[in-house]
Amino acid sequence: MATQHPIGKKTACVVGGTGFVASLLVKLLLQKGYAVNTTVRDPDNQKKVSHLLELQELGDLKIFRADLTDELSFEAPIAGCDFVFHVATPVHFASEDPENDMIKPAVQGVVNVMKACTRAKSVKRVILTSSAAAVTINQLDGTGLVVDEKNWTDIEFLTSAKPPTWGYPASKTLAEKAAWKFAEENNIDLITVIPTLMAGSSLTSDVPSSIGLAMSLITGNEFLINGMKGMQMLSGSVSIAHVEDVCRAHIFVAEKESASGRYICCAANTSVPELAKFLSKRYPQYKVPTDFGDFPSKSKLIISSDKLVKEGFSFKYGIEEIYDESVEYFKAKGLLQN
């Protein structure tokens, strides 16, 4: 059993600490002087937790064993915390049974964590990482449409049409809706952060799938390029943010007393052909494809972060910086030539 943190420090629990977003969030919280508890499924998995063990040098970080399917496993890590960041989500893109592999565990995981929050009297606010996939997938027609926090993905369309990888947007949408329902019924101060596709660099030993997807036009990975096209066709745009800005947004809305509701975190909206043109010009040394035939060259919609910006948040990274860092990260990983 981990001992309590010293009194006087703000304490945060980050659920799912081995992930791309969560591990950087842990790092930023430690750098801000927080005491941090984080949960992982298997603390004995050296490959998965080595980067967290290194972060213990930055400050007061305790690692707990917890599983989204086991409500009681969150009691100890959440006890005494001011903020709880629920970042973990089950992802099985190749699943043949998304209902049981992703949707049910995501919803159950959110409810289990929030139940533990109701029992820990210290928790002031819960911050849930949702996804633009919970906002943008609907049957809106036209171009130049602006979507914001009022919009929700159309679950009936997803579950009836079952487009490729439909389980992920369905799980994120239903998990966020379950969180809002539980928060209202149990008087929890909940905020959701809604990031778009994330890139930059990662503390994890494995390359996150989202950076792989964002980098596909540069690496020439046909399977992932088709994934980007599918994203544009399904959600209406290729929208992107730097993972550090997404983590900064989580901390910003946790600390900002006036914050409430949902917050989209998106730095740039584009399309596959527009992005390819930009990347081809910026990195001529990589043979970025620019001919996409009759594939739509304009995005159908803009995902707006106006609410977050009006609250006082400012983005550190535009699309140039996002890709410069992602390219350097891929070079360091040996996935790109100089």
UniProtKB/Swiss-Prot annotation:
Q: What Pfam family is a match for this entry?
A: Epimerase
Q: What is its EC number?
A: 1.3.1.112
So which residues are the signal peptide here? none
GO MF term set: anthocyanidin reductase activity; oxidoreductase activity, acting on the CH-OH group of donors, NAD or NADP as acceptor
Q: In which pathway does it act?
A: Secondary metabolite biosynthesis; flavonoid biosynthesis
* Keyword terms: Flavonoid biosynthesis, NADP, Oxidoreductase
Q: Which GO terms describe its biological process?
A: flavonoid biosynthetic process
Identify the SUPFAM superfamilies for this entry. Answer: NAD(P)-binding Rossmann-fold domains
**Quick check: keyword DNA repair in the entry?**
no
- Which purpose does this protein serve, as stated in its record? Produces the terminal flavan-3-ol monomers required for the formation of proanthocyanidins or condensed tannins in leaves and flowers, as well as in the skin and seeds of developing berries. Catalyzes the double reduction of anthocyanidins, producing a mixture of (2S,3S)- and (2S,3R)-flavan-3-ols.
As for family, the record states: Belongs to the NAD(P)-dependent epimerase/dehydratase family. Dihydroflavonol-4-reductase subfamily.
| Miscellaneous comment in the UniProt entry for this protein | Hyperbolic binding of NADPH and NADP(+) to the free enzyme, with a single binding site each. The most likely enzymatic mechanism is sequential ordered Bi-Uni-Uni-Bi, with NADPH binding first and NADP(+) released last.
Put simply, this protein is called Anthocyanidin reductase ((2S)-flavan-3-ol-forming)
Q: Which organism is it from?
A: Vitis vinifera
